[in-house]
A protein has these predicted regions:
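N-terminal signal-anchor/first transmembrane alpha helix
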Residues: 1-34, 104, 114, 118
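Transmembrane alpha-helices
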Residues: 11, 122, 174, 180-194, ...
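Short membrane-interfacial helix/loop motifs at transmembrane-helix boundaries
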Residues: 22-74, 245, 298
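Transmembrane alpha-helix signature in integral membrane proteins
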Residues: 73-107
C-alpha cells in the first residue's frame, strides 16, 4: 500500500481524533475537576505538567462528584427525560409530515422534481436564527396566525402557542423536515411501480399494497430520517429557548445555562458527557441498520 493511499485512509481517523476524541477528553477532564472561582472556573485534578505522576494522582483521587450531583438533583434527569420525549414526539411528527411530501415528490412529473427538491432545500439558504425568529412573528399572540384566525372569526381571543411545547414541536419539525424528506425520497425513488401492480394482482387492496410494498421498501429511508431528526433534536438549544421559553425543559438549555449563566463548567461538562452517552445509543443503532442494509444488498 503506497503512502498516498495510507494518507487518504488515515484522514478520517485524524479528523475524528482532532475534532472528537481530543475535545471529548478535555470535557471529560473538566467534568472530573472541582469548581473554583477563577478563570477558567475549575480546578483541574489532572496536571499534565506533572507527567505520569499527575495521572497517578488523578487515578488515586478519582471521584465522580459532579456525576453524582446530576443524579441527586431531579432537574437534570427530568431535563434528560423531557428532551427524549420532545425529540421522539417531534421525530414522529416530522415523519408524518415528511413521508407524504417525499411520496408526492416521487410521483410528481419528472420536470417538476428539480423545482420541488429546490423548495425542500431552499430554507438552508437562510440563517437558522432568522427562520426561528420568523416563527416568533407567526405564533405570538399578535402574530400573523392569530391575526388571521381572528379576522376569519374562527377564534374570539388569541391562541397561546408561543412559549409552549407546541411551538417547540413546530420549530423542530420545520427545521429538520428536509433531513426526513431527503432519505425517504432517495428510498422511494428506487421503487418499481410494477411491484404495486403485482401486489394488487395477487389480491392486496391499494392500502395493503401501499403498506406492504411502498412503506416496506422505504424503511431504510424512514429509519435514516428518524435518526437524522432525533439526534440533533435531543440536544437542541435555540428552538426551545426562543419558541419554548422558560416553560420548556430540555437538556440543551440546561447545559447552556450551566456553562454561560452559572459558569459551572464542571457540572456542565458532566451534563455534556451523559448527553453524549445517550446519543451514542441511536448512533450505534443507525450504524447497525446501515450495515444490515449493505449486507442485504450484496
Amino acid at each position: 500500500m503506497n503512502f498516498s493511499r495510507k494518507f487518504l485512509i488515515g484522514l478520517p481517523y485524524v479528523w475524528l481524533l482532532v475534532l472528537f476524541l481530543v475535545p471529548f477528553l478535555i470535557v471529560f477532564k473538566i467534568a472530573l475537576s472541582d469548581y473554583a472561582i477563577s478563570i477558567p472556573p475549575y480546578a483541574p485534578t489532572l496536571e499534565l505538567a506533572n507527567g505520569w505522576q499527575g495521572i497517578v494522582d488523578l487515578i488515586s483521587g478519582l471521584d465522580f462528584e459532579n456525576f453524582v450531583f446530576l443524579l441527586d438533583d431531579d432537574l437534570y434527569w427530568k431535563a434528560y427525560l423531557s428532551s427524549v420525549q420532545i425529540a421522539a414526539t417531534a421525530t414522529v411528527l416530522t415523519l408524518l409530515v415528511g413521508f407524504p411530501i417525499a411520496y408526492g415528490m416521487v410521483n410528481a412529473p419528472d420536470e417538476w422534481r428539480p423545482s420541488l427538491m429546490m423548495l425542500v432545500i431552499l430554507p438552508f439558504w437562510t440563517s437558522f436564527l432568522i427562520r426561528v425568529y420568523a416563527w416568533i412573528g407567526l405564533l405570538s399572540n399578535e402574530g400573523l396566525l392569530n391575526s388571521f384566525l381572528l379576522w376569519l372569526g374562527v377564534i374570539s381571543e388569541p391562541l397561546i402557542i408561543l412559549n409552549t411545547n407546541i411551538a417547540v414541536y413546530i420549530g423542530i419539525v420545520y427545521t429538520y423536515l428536509p433531513f426526513m424528506i431527503l432519505p425517504i425520497y432517495a428510498s422511494l425513488e428506487k421503487l418499481d411501480a410494477s411491484l404495486l401492480e403485482a401486489a394488487q394482482d395477487l389480491g392486496c387492496t391499494r392500502i395493503g399494497a401501499f403498506w406492504s410494498v411502498t412503506v416496506h421498501l422505504a424503511k431504510p429511508g424512514i429509519i435514516a430520517g428518524c435518526f437524522l431528526v432525533f439526534i440533533p433534536a435531543l440536544g437542541e438549544v435555540v428552538i426551545p429557548s426562543l419558541l419554548g421559553g422558560s416553560r420548556t425543559l430540555m437538556i440543551g438549555k440546561v447545559l447552556w445555562e450551566e456553562f454561560f449563566s452559572n459558569r459551572d463548567w464542571t457540572v456542565a461538562s458532566a451534563v455534556a458527557i451523559i448527553l453524549l452517552l445517550i446519543l451514542v445509543i441511536p448512533i450505534v443503532l443507525f450504524q447497525r441498520n446501515e450495515q444490515k442494509q449493505r449486507e442485504a444488498g450484496k
